[in-house]
């Protein structure tokens, strides 16, 4: 609302395919449907899996660099097992909510942790390309699904992936390769 109240515009389902840069100043964007939007300021809110936007930035000589990220799997468990382990009883009391957990560990100076634990949750596909295998988790408001799920991830550093450290796409390409397996 703040952006709109200040005279800004928000465009959904509108893919940016190029930047408008004049004399080293950002002036606007060009979109896939042929439109051009110019403004004194543009917020680039790329969202999930916007690898193509990193290429647009790089092609426009905007410095980008690879950074460590977390990569992992989503693990599903019967909710009853999590409740038993966390509440230390064979049957969860009806006034207690479905239990959750958080795992955090450092192994050889590398973070390994659970992420986005979804008690009474659902695993859902969320690939952005047809040839990807990507999932996420969520919990309905009542958290009444018989299963729980959680992401379990490990930190991936530049030195974990072959190739020069100066390649800004090294880790993005690695991520894309994993998601296509």
Pin down the residues of each PLM region:
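Residues forming the flavin
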Residues: 1-181
């Amino acid at each position: 609302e703040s952006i709109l109240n200040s005279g800004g515009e928000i465009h959904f389902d509108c893919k940016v395919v190029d930047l408008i840069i004049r004399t080293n100043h950002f002036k606007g964007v060009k979109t896939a449907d042929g439109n051009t939007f110019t403004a004194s300021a543009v917020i680039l809110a790329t969202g999930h899996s916007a690898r193509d936007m990193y290429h647009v930035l790089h092609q426009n000589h905007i410095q980008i660099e690879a950074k460590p990220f977390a990569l992992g799997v989503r693990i599903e468990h019967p909710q009853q097992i999590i409740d038993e382990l966390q509440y230390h009883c064979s049957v969860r009391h009806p006034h207690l909510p479905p239990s959750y957990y958080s795992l955090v560990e450092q192994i050889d100076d590398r973070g390994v942790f659970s992420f986005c634990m979804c008690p009474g949750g659902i695993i859902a596909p969320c690939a952005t390309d047809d040839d990807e295998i990507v999932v996420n988790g969520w919990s309905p408001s009542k958290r009444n699904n018989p299963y729980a799920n959680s992401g379990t991830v490990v930190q991936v550093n530049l030195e974990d992936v072959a190739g020069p450290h100066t390649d800004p796409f090294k880790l993005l390409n690695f991520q894309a390769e994993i998601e296509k397996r």
